[in-house]
A protein has these predicted regions:
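Secretory targeting and sorting signals
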Residues: 1-21
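Active-site beta->alpha N-cap acidic-glycine motif
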Residues: 22-100, 119
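C-terminal domain-boundary segment and adjacent tail
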Residues: 22-35, 59-60, 74, 188-218
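Extracytoplasmic/secreted proteins, especially bacterial periplasmic and envelope-associated proteins
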Residues: 38, 52, 78, 108-111, ...
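Structural recognition of the beta-strand scaffold that forms the well-ordered cores
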Residues: 39-43, 64-68, 90-93, 129-133, ...
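Acidic-and-aromatic substrate-binding clefts and catalytic sites of carbohydrate-active enzymes
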Residues: 46-49, 68-77, 100-106, 132-138, ...
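CE4/NodB-like, metal-dependent polysaccharide N-deacetylase domain
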Residues: 56-58, 62-63, 90, 106-139, ...
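His/Asp/Glu-enriched short active-site or ligand-binding loop at hydrolase and phosphoryl-transfer sites
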Residues: 127, 137-175, 203-214
């Protein structure tokens, strides 16, 4: 696929030195600089297709970025196409198999990032431009691979609202925060808690990509 391109880019960056290696690579974003009273809701993976969470997203018209694994989306694509078509959802890249990308060679990174992009494009008719690296694991080699696959920004998160065992403490959200959720059995409750936290802070959910553009990050 793009292994040769990755190798050429890697050699060029190495010759330019470590400082130059960061020039032109997609940014890693865990919070969006903005003066607007907004937060960004993101949901990962896609294994649990919760109808109650879908109802909340659709009824409240919540802008949301879905960082999907192609396999998780493939057995019920209609669940996600409804969120896109009737709601305010966009589908983004979360790799094929959810590996720690920093542990893979160039070919492995290419297969995971480009491969997921191609599969999601085939399923939803749009090539994702944002990547959430699994576990938030990222380095310049991951950014280089992402760039070769057409990724404009790597998006991590400010706060994880997912209930992993016990309900986590609810932080006070600030403008530009990125909220992480997962398609788990607790998604509906986690989503409502995040929306309540945003409302308590005087913030509204907003679409991520337009604000990344406004901030000059993509």
């Amino acid at each position: 696929m793009l292994v040769a391109a990755l190798a050429s880019l890697s050699l060029a960056l190495g010759a330019a030195g470590s400082a130059q290696a960061r020039v032109g690579l997609p940014p890693v974003v865990n919070r969006v600089p903005t003066q607007e009273k907004v937060v960004f809701i993101t949901i990962d993976d896609g294994w649990n297709h919760d109808p109650e969470a879908a109802r909340i997203l659709l009824e409240k018209r919540v802008p949301v970025s879905l960082f999907l694994l192609p396999g998780a989306a493939s057995y019920d694509t209609e669940y996600f196409t409804r969120l896109i078509g009737e709601g305010r959802a966009s589908v983004e890249n979360h790799t094929v198999n959810h590996p720690d990308l920093t542990t893979l060679d160039a070919a492995g990174k290419d297969a995971e990032v480009c491969g997921a992009g191609e599969q999601l494009q085939a399923a939803f008719g749009r090539t994702p431009k944002l990547l959430r690296p699994p576990y938030g694991a990222v380095n310049d080699e991951v950014r280089l691979a992402a760039k070769a696959c057409g990724v404009k920004a790597l998006v991590t998160w400010t706060y994880d609202f997912t209930t992993w065992g016990e309900t986590p403490p609810t932080p006070r959200l600030r403008s530009g925060d990125i909220v992480l959720l997962h398609f788990t059995p607790t998604l509906a409750a986690d989503l409502q808690r995040a929306l309540d936290a945003a409302k308590a802070a005087g913030l509204k959910p907003a679409a991520l990509m337009p604000h990344l553009k406004t901030a000059g990050l993509v």
